[in-house]
Amino acid sequence: MAAHKMSLTSLFFVSIVIVLSLFSGFGEGRYIKYRAIAKDRVPDCTQDPKNCVRVPVNQYHLPPGCQNTTHCYREKYHI
């Protein structure tokens, strides 16, 4: 009786594993499209036009006490 009960339990477990393995592959992505990683492209620009606006970066902003010539060298190395 115990061997029969064990075989039903193992059969149930194996069948659950098979069913779950069949359904696990439906939602995964197979590859990344080159559009998604293209240079100079804002993601989701076609779906939401609000995301298409790029915010310009201030290249000349330095923290207080820094100069363009030293680039905070004195603060890093305590000169």
From Swiss-Prot:
It comes from the Eukaryota. Disulfide bonds join C45-C52, C66-C72. Pfam families: RALF. Coiled coil: none annotated. InterPro entries: RALF. It is found in: Secreted. The keyword Disulfide bond applies. The keyword Secreted applies. Glycans are attached at N68. Keywords: Disulfide bond, Glycoprotein, Hormone, Secreted, Signal. Its main location: secreted. GO terms for biological process: calcium-mediated signaling; regulation of growth. GO terms for cellular component: extracellular region. Residues 1-29 form the signal peptide. GO terms for molecular function: hormone activity. Cell signaling peptide that may regulate plant stress, growth, and development. Mediates a rapid alkalinization of extracellular space by mediating a transient increase in the cytoplasmic Ca(2+) concentration leading to a calcium-dependent signaling events through a cell surface receptor and a concomitant activation of some intracellular mitogen-activated protein kinases. Belongs to the plant rapid alkalinization factor (RALF) family. This is Protein RALF-like 35.
